Amino acid sequence: MDTISQMLEEAAQEHGPRLALKMRKGLCLEKYTYKDLWRKAQCTAGLLQNRGMEKGERVLLWAPNSPSWVIAYLGVLIGGGVVVPLDVQSTPHFVAKVVAQTEPVLALLSTSIPEAARTPSVPIAYLEDLPHLLRREKAVFQQPQIQGQDLAEIMYTSGTTGEPKGVMLTHRNLVYNVETGRQMIPVNPDSKALSLLPLSHIYAQFAGLLSPLHCGASIIYLPSRQPNTLLRVLRREGITTVALVPQLLQLIMSHIERGVERRGAADLWRFMHRLAPRLPMTVRRILFRSVHRELGGCLQFLLCGGAYLDPSLAQKWESLGIPILQGYGMTETAAMVTYDTLYHRRLGTVGRPPPGQQVEIAPDGEILVRGENVFIGYWRNANATKQTFRDGWYCTGDLGYLDSDGYLHFKGRKKNLIVLADGMNVYPEDIENCLNLRPEIKEAVVIDLPKNGGLVEVHAVILVADPENVEQAVRETNRLLASHQQVRGFTVWSGEDFPRTHTLKVKRHEVLDVLAAADKFAEEQPEIPSRQIDSDLRHLVAKIAGLPREDIGPQSVLGLDLGLDSLSIVELLCLIEEEMSISVEEGQLPAQATVGDLEAILADVERLEEPTIFPDWPAGLAARATRILLQRVLVDPLLAFLCPTQVKGLENLVDISGPALFIANHTSHLDTPVVLKVLLRRYGSRLSAAAAADYWFANPLLGNLIALLFNAFPMARQGNARPCMEHIVDLVDRGWSVLIFPEGTRSPNGELQPFKAGVGLLAVELGIPVVPIKLSGLQQVLPKGSWLPRRGPVTVTIGASLRLLPGMDYVQATQQLEREIRRL
């Protein structure tokens, strides 16, 4: 196996019906089996070939993670094209340079990319339009002859403001690492991998896409990095492994520890952590079983790479009974060079080279690498390529050593490159060039200033020409930089000049030593207003930033003034949700957001209501068996006596496979049991019905009774209906069909009432067959306002199923469904 096309075809043949990709975003659910994925990738390749992509042509891919991103990526590769993936946070200036270098024939973008950032010189297709384009054009895929040595990707290692370098990776580079990883990492067809990291980066592609696909695992993509969302998905999906960077590991651990503190169990937590290292892993999992329940109960191990991992943080996770498998690599090695394995790992190291991977240590301590995973050079940059290789060895620019057991110890970087805790690379010279253009600044040196927990921040040390306006100069410069390049703090250098070498280069290590010895580099901020929301927020911001509350004001920029990077902001938003019951997503924050901006957002957002509880027990085996028994011996005979039922249109159910959304008019309390009786033979007990939360579930005893008899769940008729809709998505995702009454309440006279708009939203976003049902006669048997039924005939008419097109207007969808019921 030498190409991604061969790998994907083999996976489709071996694991065809298994789930390959899945993502839930709001009420939209995307799922693809391996067979679906192979077919969609081929169709996409044909579409791209129709749009002018030939073998070796470059295609820009600029979008957030999603199954559509994966399909587009694979479509380019199996069609013979070369993918140029871009980070969603790339600046327009950087993208323009990449476009100029690679000359792509097409750009595949998400509509979420700001319009001002898009390049007008390249034809654009939007990933959101991909399903529609595939249906409309029905392109025929022409299989090109692809070899292992053919170029697969040109990856630009993060955004730089200088001349970016494109790393050329072949199909064989990618496949070799995937094959090697399969021997080292225990992923199999029963694994469920959660992919959080941006797929525009090679580590995420390896650990969150290619490696799981090669093993037949299921990959779950997540649109949010907030711990609350992450933990919900871990529980709901039964996730077995996650690939993370150290900062995300710390983010989740901090979330867990805050919960421990709120429960008043901090002393017990510390005692258990002191005890755990002496115990076997199985016993540790029992000791921390409550944490494992919170993490879904299925987590087997975590993968960590992309940046330095503090051994003390790794030990915390190991103490929980969750192994941390570290690795070392970079874009130029198609992700991985060394690996930990489940049974051979050593804290403080980054693993061992697998068989076939050559690692040497140069006399000066530099790590040298050779193997089939090493890139072939930089795109159209022979000089940079030549400087990177020495006698066939790739010079990593990293320092380290191999111990007697072959474990690699990473000691630091030989070059000036800054690697942030989220795995993003920052080139100091690029930021320095921008800062040095400002008239207020004589010269700037950008360094990685150490913070607590082994983290670093991008910090500028400045020789000033205009001390009064230096802060404004830094702020203005930040507007030109990508989010990971932001200067998080700065220091005015007190001397006349920086320490320099005899060739006048700044001695960065001496500058860093001076800063490390100083006690504090901060200026006073304006006082915080006394409103409670501001006071609460100031406390939480101070906690995340590690600063005194009095140093934080409404004009404090979260990045520049407080040193918060993107993941620190995610942690802050998580803390706000936990402590203030207000949910804010990253996307709601403006660029260069200040504390005042966040205060304004919080003031406009309603506090979260108590979450609606949807118990799992009605879907359990015991409840389902009891339900079938009660329906057959009690409910069905009673209905047969009260309302002899004629059923029309059963043939419309024959061609429906999988879950469906049943919609019916609502005239009586008997509507649900009658419909369930009609559908029982075909759908058994895998059918759930919505019932008015305020009517049936206000009394717990009554709510539990109808949950048992009819597998009913509460649906809010007033207020926030979103939790209920998300529960419906959960049911459909698990293969259940759902019955709802779109009128929202019983008709007082038997006439069809206008439908609530939510049914259109559900029908469009779920993407499953919608089956209309017309009930006649029940209004005479048990009308609204009566509890004493009268015997009478009933007719149930089942209409033909329909699927609503993705992207259809919800109001129009609702109107169409109402018309379907009226026609019956």
Q: Where on the chain are the PLM-derived regions?
A:
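AMP-binding/adenylate-forming catalytic core of the ANL superfamily
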Residues: S90, A107, I361, G371, ...
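Conserved ATP-dependent adenylate/AMP-binding module captured primarily in the ANL superfamily
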Residues: V88-A116, L133-E137, N177-L194, Q226-T240
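Non-catalytic C-terminal accessory region of glycerolipid acyltransferases
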Residues: V470, A516, R722-L824
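Conserved AMP-binding/adenylate-forming
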Residues: V242, V283-L408, K414-L417, I431-E432, ...
